Curated annotation (Swiss-Prot):
Keyword presence, Repeat: no
Tissue/organ expression: Expressed by the venom duct.
Protein's recorded name: Augerpeptide hhe6.3
This protein's GO CC annotations: extracellular region
Disulfide bonds: C11-C20, C15-C25, C19-C29
Domain of life assignment: Eukaryota
Primary residence: secreted
Organism: Hastula hectica (Sea snail)
Keyword set includes Secreted: yes
Entry's localization field: Secreted
Length: 31
Protein backbone atom coordinates (compact mmCIF):
# COMPACT_ATOMS: atom_id res chain seq x y z
CA UNK A 1 0.00 0.00 0.00
CA UNK A 2 1.48 3.30 -1.10
CA UNK A 3 0.38 5.56 1.70
CA UNK A 4 2.43 8.48 2.96
CA UNK A 5 1.49 9.85 6.38
CA UNK A 6 0.70 13.58 6.26
CA UNK A 7 3.63 14.40 8.54
CA UNK A 8 5.98 13.02 5.88
CA UNK A 9 4.51 14.86 2.91
CA UNK A 10 6.56 18.00 3.38
CA UNK A 11 5.66 21.49 2.23
CA UNK A 12 7.62 21.71 -1.00
CA UNK A 13 8.90 25.25 -1.56
CA UNK A 14 6.30 26.87 0.66
CA UNK A 15 8.56 26.85 3.72
CA UNK A 16 11.57 25.16 5.24
CA UNK A 17 11.32 21.60 6.57
CA UNK A 18 11.89 22.94 10.08
CA UNK A 19 8.66 24.92 9.78
CA UNK A 20 6.69 22.18 8.08
CA UNK A 21 4.39 19.94 10.12
CA UNK A 22 1.70 17.67 8.76
CA UNK A 23 2.26 19.03 5.27
CA UNK A 24 1.57 22.58 6.41
CA UNK A 25 3.75 25.58 7.19
CA UNK A 26 3.46 26.46 10.84
CA UNK A 27 2.52 30.01 11.91
CA UNK A 28 5.34 32.33 12.93
CA UNK A 29 7.80 30.68 10.56
CA UNK A 30 9.83 32.35 7.85
CA UNK A 31 9.79 30.91 4.34
Amino acid sequence: VLFTPPELLGCGNRCSDDCCKWGRCQPGCTD
